[in-house]
Amino acid sequence: MSRPAATLVLRNAVVATCDRGPSDAGLLPGAAVAVEGRRVAWVGRERDVEAEVNLAGAQVIDARGGLVTPGLVDSHTHLVFAGERAGEFALRCAGRTYLQVALSGGGIAVTTRETRAAPDEQLLAAAAARARRLIAQGVTTLEVKSGYGLDAPEELRLLRIVHQLGRALGGDATILPTLLFHAVPPEQVGDRAGFVRDACASLIPQVARERLAQFCDVFVEDGAFAPDEARLLLQAAKDRGLVPRVHAEQLTAGGGARLAAELGCSSADHLEELDDAGIAALAQARVVAGLLPLSTLFLGSERYAPARRLLEAGVPVSLATNMNPGSAMSENVGLTLSLACLKLRLTPAEALVAFTAGGARALRQPDLGRVARGADADLVLWGCGSPEHLAWHMAVNHALVVVKHGRVVHEAPPAAMVDCR
């Protein structure tokens, strides 16, 4: 059997393969990873790499004892928007709830007005800046939702901007677009049934026909969409080949998780108000539970998703930033990992697996989120030697080198390089 001809090798590493289940990061100390082109060609012991891999012509990175993981998969983001909601943040700091602000004319309505008024170039530039901040922290795959246009023409415009974002990043990250039904447009609040009917008959088929999205997501919540409305939208999307997902049980127990199980959604995200029946439904249907602890922190709540109960019930979990202007205005990967441990009670290994393999599962991307022969060569070298350190040293960017499809797309300055041995 011929040796793989490596184009990139990371040596002297602690490799986390993230392919051994939800609670095992698959740590391999004293290890190396060899990449051939866009794929992982070999993973094994450092002492074997020279005998088993052709290193002639390969770019070699000495990890110096640092942790090498799969590229992070941020499976839930809202990067395309304009404007700010800092004033709303101050109101919530003074005691108003998210729902109270929304019902008084704030919330999504504010972002919708600003986003509709912004030109494409402004929206693209802002989204690209947010994506670049995530890439610099080890994210190599991003799900990006529409949702702030609300009506059909604006939602189509936002999805086209998401596609432009992928091109603007030049292959430095994979962008997976989602059509999000966030709320009924203000122009159609008097005819909710008509809006849903038109979306099923026109918007969703056009999105599918033009291949503008891979997923369709619905916010199932008081003031957004009822389960019966969401069922119609998601079934129409599923019939057209889009993968259904839901925002579920974030602010109230609205039945979104059971709907996700019924429809075979790839994920049900948020879940702060999830009950035992919802957990059982997700477990039986093998729907991924999307954990978004930055949102809970940002909204000033102490009611986090029941992550431990989900894991104990056998529900697969993912971890994501939920970067958005209303409930998680942050791209901080390190803080997300730390909150997963401190508030969701995940172990550091579980948090890392959820942010890699879990995200890949939520997005139905089997070649992502793991370090294994044949998998996509999306890798991160961190300036520490363990998942525990990543979560312990809070809100810090530990990413030293980020690799996408076998190509270094981000590298920290030399002064940031550390020896972890």
UniProtKB/Swiss-Prot annotation:
GO molecular function (one): zinc ion binding
Gene3D superfamilies: Metal-dependent hydrolases, Urease, subunit C, domain 1
UniProt feature coiled coil, ranges: none
Positions annotated to bind 4-imidazolone-5-propanoate: 85, 148, 182, 250, 327
Reported cofactor(s): Zn(2+); Fe(3+)
Stated role: Catalyzes the hydrolytic cleavage of the carbon-nitrogen bond in imidazolone-5-propanoate to yield N-formimidoyl-L-glutamate. It is the third step in the universal histidine degradation pathway.
Descriptive protein name: Imidazolonepropionase
Gene source species: Anaeromyxobacter dehalogenans (strain 2CP-C)
